[in-house]
Amino acid sequence: MSINNLFDVSGRKALVTGAGRGIGKVLAIALAEAGCDVAILEIDKKTAESTATEIRQKGRKSIAIQVDITKKEQVDKAFAETAKALGGLDICINNAGISIQKPAEELPEVDWDKVIDINLKGVFLCSQAAARIMIPQKSGSIINIASMSGIAVNVPQKQAVYNTSKAGVAMLTKSLAVEWAPYGIRVNSVSPGYMKTEMTMASMTHLFPTWESLTPMGRLGVPEELRGAVVYLGSDASSYMTGHDLVIDGGYTAR
């Protein structure tokens, strides 16, 4: 196989959660541009359909499915619908997640449960549903979007529950990689650093100078800088890579 063909994902069937906006939307469109058909799973049906429409305009098949990833029945139904509509599932990107920033001593139990349910339980339920499709195929790539927050404690924001959830995603990734390797399923994670997204631009711009000063490259990343990593992990170029956390943080965790 030539080096160019190693990175070829054209014709593969992909699914991205939380792809109505932000990082998830960028990754879903990137896969479509690389030749994948893509299912968009989102809690917000309107934004999901918007992303799916953009993908269809690029000449690829895309469906939008409204789903609460913390509900097993909804997840299983959405994945079954995806496999039927696209003709299988080769790449699953578990991107959906939330962050709540409050001092740990003041964090309500309901907020802890909400973040853990979406960021960790949701990733597990979606990975489980993906594996049930991929095991009979004897192939597949699951890519979990973790965070550098699962490796290093962020400052100055206080977000113990978010950090904990993302550390859990990284370990879940390793555990599933070992369990499912015999079935030809690879499971890896991507841990972004500070990113300029719709969410951070809307409410966290006052923190940008601090974040930039703590990042060796001196700037925040943009979601588009994650596209290459996802195509790599979804392609045959990463055929011997599983259980790995790919950190893309401008050098933050290398300090």
Regions found by a protein language model. Give the residues of each.
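Alpha-helical segment proximal to the catalytic Tyr-Lys
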Residues: R132, V178-P182, S239
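Substrate-binding pocket helix/loop in short-chain dehydrogenase/reductase
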Residues: V75, P103-A104, P108-I116, K158, ...
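Canonical Rossmann dinucleotide-binding motif of NAD(H)/NADP(H)-dependent dehydrogenases/reductases
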Residues: V9-V38
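Short C-terminal tail/terminal secondary-structure segment
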Residues: S2-F7, V231, T242-R255
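Active-site helix of classical SDR
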Residues: S127, S165, T173
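Short, small/polar-rich loop/turn modules that mediate ligand/substrate recognition or access, typified
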Residues: G88, A181, R186, M241-G243
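Residue(s) in the substrate-gating loop at a strand-loop-helix junction
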Residues: S147
